[in-house]
Amino acid sequence: MKSILNDFLLMIQFFTRIPINKNLQCEKANFRRGAFFLPVVASIIGGMEFLIYLGLKNFLPSNVIIVLLLLFTAMITGGLHMDGLADTCDGFFSLRDKERIIEIMKDSRIGSYGTIALIIDLLLKYQLLYSLVLKGYSIAIFLAPIIGRISILFLCLSKRTAKKNGSGNIFIGNMSKPIVFFISTIVLVLSTYFLGLRATIIPFIGALLITYLLYLLCLNKINGLTGDTLGACNELGEITFLLILLMM
């Protein structure tokens, strides 16, 4: 039980800015087991966002609430996944060789492609969430973060790391297939309860497809995955899920 609590708190500590004032075991095995709780952490984030929406919807216009939710997401996650998206775009669109791309991705300064990617990311999330709320799919506020993290888990089934050392290496190739598929089944059942089978399966398949395409792009550009590409995967998975859901 103590080990389970450690791994759960480790995921909260790693993926959010929620203060966990506790010394935790951070071995690779802890992250492997802790992956089980990544969608749980995402459900906490999505749940808080949905509660904020419910609490404000009678007082503020929906478009204003969505802006506040995007701000809240950036604060609660520290912009972790958006930073990964920006770094990935800066590197991949530089059209350099593998070593130079990785150097660019490690640079703490954001470039023009990263800036453009962040603007498009936020604009798409804003418009998609706002449109879905108007369409009666406000539950997408809760579900999208979970689907994004599921996309990360599937990407991490690959063992191809682009760097010998990197924060992403504690996840890449360190996932248990049975756990990933078990978690995905639970998420699909949950989503089906809220959205129905068709509105769950098709957007979910779309998110997995974009994850696979990103994987192929990563192999082509840097011969593997990094922590930044995992962050990019989360953002692309969320947006793809929301976009296809809106089209349903």
Curated annotation (Swiss-Prot):
Any Gene Ontology CC annotation: plasma membrane
This enzyme's EC code(s): 2.7.8.26
Keywords, in A-Z order: Cell membrane, Cobalamin biosynthesis, Magnesium, Membrane, Transferase, Transmembrane, Transmembrane helix
Compartment(s): Cell membrane
Residue stretches spanning the membrane: 36-56, 59-79, 114-134, 137-157, 170-190, 199-219
Disulfide bonds: none
Membrane topology note: Multi-pass membrane protein
Protein name: Adenosylcobinamide-GDP ribazoletransferase
Protein source organism: Clostridium botulinum (strain Loch Maree / Type A3)
Gene name per UniProt: cobS
